[in-house]
A protein has these predicted regions:
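Conserved lysine of the Walker
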Residues: 51
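Short hydrophobic/aromatic beta-strand immediately N-terminal to the Walker A/P-loop
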Residues: 40-42
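P-loop (Walker A) phosphate-binding loop of NTP-binding proteins
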Residues: 44-46
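Short beta-strand-centered segment that lines the nucleotide-binding/catalytic pocket of NTP-utilizing
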Residues: 64-79
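Short phosphate-coordinating micro-motif centered on Lys-Gly-acidic
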Residues: 2-19, 60, 95-101, 106-151
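Switch II (G3) loop of P-loop NTPases
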Residues: 86-96
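Pre-Walker A adenine-sensing motif
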Residues: 25-34
């Protein structure tokens, strides 16, 4: 059983949750409070689905005091928390997996930190096997987000 299995809520039916935006924020905070480093969480989903909102909530629950902003242009933001550093990485603008080396990818993912990665599919095979994947989805006529957890 993966070390992060305790982070998947019992109410998840077959690994799925349906949450409003407010519930997503609360769940993210709970996830952050329960997270134990080292932990890499990947956040996938279309633009505007709530990946950064969830990352902000996880960071808040984890104890980050700073304002959490999207790292779309900087690619990586590092934050301080009592448990460990937090790296929030957005790979949307990454043009090739080779650029990960310039970001310090290997050092970050092997560190004793909480690592949140948006657009992880751009990292291809360089993701560690023991990460927690979270996939977010929504439809325009439904105010909830569908969360798929693989744990």
């Amino acid at each position: 059983m993966p070390a992060h299995r305790h982070l998947v809520p019992q109410r998840a039916s077959k690994g799925h949750l349906r949450l409003t935006e407010g519930e997503l924020r609360h769940w993210g905070e709970d996830l952050g409070r329960a997270a134990t480093p080292p932990l890499l969480i990947t956040l996938t989903g279309e633009l505007g689905v709530g990946k950064t909102t969830l990352a902000q909530s996880i960071c808040f629950g984890y104890g980050v005091k700073e304002e959490i902003t999207s790292p779309t242009y900087a690619l990586v933001h590092e934050y301080v928390a009592a448990k460990s550093p937090v790296f929030h990485i957005d790979l949307y603008r990454l043009e090739s997996p080779e650029q990960l080396t310039n970001l310090g990818w290997d050092e970050i993912v092997s560190s004793r930190a909480l690592v949140l990665v948006e657009w992880p599919e751009r990292a291809e095979s360089r993701l560690p096997d023991d990460h927690l994947p979270i996939d977010l989805d929504y439809t325009a006529d439904d105010p909830t987000r569908r969360i798929l957890l693989a744990g």
